[in-house]
Amino acid sequence: MGYVAIKGGEEAIENSLNLYEETLQSSNKIKTEDVTTGLRFAVDKVMSEGSLYSKKLASIAIKKSAGDLLNAAFFLRAHRSSCQRIGIAKTIDTNEMHIQRRISSAFKDIQGGQILGASNDYEVKLILNNIHQSKKWEYFNEEDNIIKSALEPLRKKNLIKNLKADNEISDITRVFPEPPYPRSAVMQTMCRGEAGSMLGFAYTSIRGYGDVHPTIGDIRTGTSIVKFTHPFTKKEVKVATLDVTACESAGTFEKQENGKVKLTTGFGFCFGFNETKAISMSILDLTLYSAKFSVGEKEFASDIEMMIHHIDGVDSMGFTNHFKLPHYVTFQSDLQVFSNASDFAKDKK
């Protein structure tokens, strides 16, 4: 690509930025706390795709971008790159989550029961006010509500396929992975992937460009405690409590190399409450790592190369929007090549 330096437009760019800030003055009147509490799913989406858990910063980013969630995630990701790293926390076990909502479409009767929690899945999608005024729920203390996955009984019976763990956990925030892509890198990429992109890829596998029709073995939203080894005392301390979503999808039974038949599963996890993203991630996990659903490059979602390079919203938006920047030299060279080719063709005649 060719670029050309622009000097004369510096003042125009400055004025454009000032005008943009002027048009967003009404956004500044909105309190950050109101965004956090009133637009919680938007905040969760930005934290997940921005790869930084901070409701306050995500809310500020939403205000700064006037509700453009892709742009807000960009702000948050950029801020993340400037944060100092002090260490690595202990791995979160989703079986130890304090559950606010947890259901299974694979099993009717499960340990702890079906906990519907707060959801509008069962609501008619009409824009009406005050249609659910009566409060008929029972209060429960989520601090004591710790239940293992509904698929755990099958796992204890050794009926579920286990994938081999990576010898070394990748960190895509430090080094972008290269082929062959470790599963830890793929899962990290999906964890901070753009929800719409992941839904689109997952849907291709369901609708006809693949062969996935999963059953939700266990999907849960709630809080997880983050623990960290103190650098001085060397004791394990609690450093944060995160809202998270985790999903285990059950695929189908698959014959293993040792001849045993086991159930394939996919796993999805993300910051905040975003069940659609977690389900999509679990479906993509199935398509990428289960031979039953993977048929080479015939299906979009079965191609790790396709997936890992096309689901990041910040990357996709950044590169797409860069086409608005000056490409004068590039286009002029195209015109020159066309002109020369036309002249050459005329001379040959």
Task: Give each language-model segment a name.
Residues 1-223, 251, 345-349:
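Short, amphipathic alpha-helical interaction segments embedded in low-complexity terminal/linker regions
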Residues 140-349:
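Acidic, serine/proline-rich low-complexity intrinsically disordered regions
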